[in-house]
A protein has these predicted regions:
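Structured beta-strand/turn binding interfaces of compact recognition modules in eukaryotic regulators
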Residues: 92, 107, 133
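Short coil/turn segments at secondary-structure boundaries
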Residues: 52, 102, 117-118, 142-144
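ATP-dependent helicase/translocase motor core
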Residues: 120-183
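Acidic, glycine-rich low-complexity segments with interspersed aromatic residues
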Residues: 2-99
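Short beta-strand and beta-hairpin "edge-sheet" elements
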Residues: 99-113
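Residue-level signal for secondary-structure boundary sites
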Residues: 47, 112, 136-138
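Short proline/glycine-enriched turn/loop segments at secondary-structure junctions
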Residues: 113-121
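Beta-strand-rich binding-surface signature
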Residues: 84-86, 101-103, 125-129
């Protein structure tokens, strides 16, 4: 079944679920009907720390409490180069707007790192380095990135000192990401 969507298209969640015949929620959405796995990297509202390093996205696996395992959709993504499941990537820069990046390929070099879960506890997560199949990421306008950073800064201002300290501790070992933008 051919999915009709173009790189850079911005759609809503209802359109995404109709197009891919997948769940309406979650960052990893498996569809047996279309033999796809839809990944949503939500930069607006998410506990996960997905990061771009040039043309490679290090995507955080599924599981919001406790250590993540290589089960369910994490296993599907981990085995995606062998199991025939086509993996599609969307990014969210503004609420309810899903920007289609394209088909991605797992580079086979997954690793684990510490991140905070939804209860604020440190845990091990799986990180999956992904590359766009065509090698060309959709360039994101730098004003979109700046707006996103401002939104995150506003949410940080609402935290108390203890919450900020805990957040800083959890990010201490995390590499800084960078991405290609357009001015």
């Amino acid at each position: 079944m051919a999915i009709q969507i173009n790189k850079g298209d911005v759609i809503n969640n209802e359109e995404l679920t109709e197009l891919f015949k997948c769940s309406t929620q979650g960052g990893m959405r498996r569809s047996h009907k279309t033999n796809t796995l839809v990944l949503v990297s939500n930069h607006v509202k998410s506990i996960y720390s997905d990061r771009w390093f040039g043309k490679e996205l290090h995507y955080t696996g599924m599981g919001s409490i406790g250590d993540q395992t290589l089960g369910t959709q994490n296993k599907t993504l981990y085995e995606s180069n062998l199991n025939g499941v086509e993996v599609h990537l969307f990014e969210v820069f503004e609420l309810r707007e899903y920007t289609y990046q394209g088909v991605v390929v797992y580079n086979g070099k997954g690793y684990q790192e510490n991140q905070t879960d939804i209860d604020g506890n440190q845990r091990k997560v799986w990180m999956f380095p992904l590359e766009l199949k065509d090698g060309k990421p959709v360039r994101v306008n730098d004003t979109v990135i700046k707006k996103l950073q401002e939104t995150k800064q506003k949410s940080l201002r609402k935290l108390n000192t203890k919450q900020i300290k805990r957040l800083a501790e959890s990010k201490k070992e995390t590499q800084q990401s960078y991405r290609i933008t357009e001015t």
